[in-house]
């Protein structure tokens, strides 16, 4: 059974999401994982077809092509800002327990519960980017509202000026 690759992401999100009391229980996971394996093998087959497309978009290198290793890994760890705990260490699949620190200490960062967790398996992504985008959208909306109010006030002032 061949599965299109665009079904892979929702399937991974469903299976790999953090577990809560309302999480889905899969008792017969054999077909699901066989679909995942098939989709991953298709992605690996199509990888060579995607390389010219990526090179046209002027990417410096593909991650699998650059064997430089440690320097690039250190740079990516420094560039990314949200904590994500991998499967190493923790309770169950992926150690999904987090605690929030105060915003003054570490703005928008999540830290795992366990202080003994492996630092090499964590990377961080920034929460500031979506916040900045939302702030920009709110500012645009405020500016539109202010322009509409200014136009209404100008119209009222013109009507008042005509009456005098």
Curated annotation (Swiss-Prot):
This is Urocortin-3. Expressed in some areas of the brain including the hypothalamus, amygdala, and brainstem, but is not evident in the cerebellum, pituitary, or cerebral cortex; it is also expressed peripherally in small intestine and skin. The modification Isoleucine amide is found at residue 160. Pfam families: CRF (PF00473). One of its GO terms (molecular function) is corticotropin-releasing hormone receptor 2 binding. Its main location: secreted. Binds with high affinity to CRF receptors 2-alpha and 2-beta. The keyword Transmembrane does not apply. Residues 110-120 have a biased composition (Basic and acidic residues). Belongs to the sauvagine/corticotropin-releasing factor/urotensin I family. It is found in: Secreted. Keywords: Amidation, Hormone, Secreted, Signal. GO terms for biological process: adenylate cyclase-activating G protein-coupled receptor signaling pathway; cellular response to hypoxia; cellular response to nutrient levels; digestion; hormone-mediated signaling pathway; neuropeptide signaling pathway; positive regulation of insulin secretion; positive regulation of membrane potential. Residues 58-120 are annotated as: Disordered. PANTHER family: UROCORTIN-2 AND 3, UROCORTIN-3. Residues 1-23 form the signal peptide. Disulfide bonds: none annotated. Residues 24-121 form a propeptide. It comes from the Eukaryota. Suppresses food intake, delays gastric emptying and decreases heat-induced edema. Might represent an endogenous ligand for maintaining homeostasis after stress. GO terms for cellular component: axon terminus; extracellular space; varicosity.
């Amino acid at each position: 059974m061949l599965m299109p690759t665009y079904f892979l992401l929702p399937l991974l999100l469903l299976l790999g999401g953090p577990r809560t009391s309302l999480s889905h229980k899969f008792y017969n996971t054999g077909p699901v994982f066989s679909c995942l394996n098939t989709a991953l093998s298709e992605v690996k087959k199509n990888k060579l077809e995607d390389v010219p497309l990526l090179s046209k978009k002027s990417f410096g290198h593909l991650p699998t092509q650059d064997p430089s290793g440690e320097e690039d890994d250190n740079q990516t760890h420094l560039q990314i800002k949200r904590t994500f705990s991998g499967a190493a260490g923790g309770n169950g699949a992926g150690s999904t327990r987090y605690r929030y620190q105060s915003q003054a200490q570490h703005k928008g960062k999540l830290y795992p519960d366990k202080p003994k967790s492996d630092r090499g398996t964590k990377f961080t992504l920034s929460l500031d980017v979506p916040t900045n985008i939302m702030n920009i959208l709110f500012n645009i909306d405020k500016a539109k509202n202010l322009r509409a109010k200014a136009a209404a006030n100008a119209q009222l002032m013109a009507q008042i000026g005509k009456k005098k």
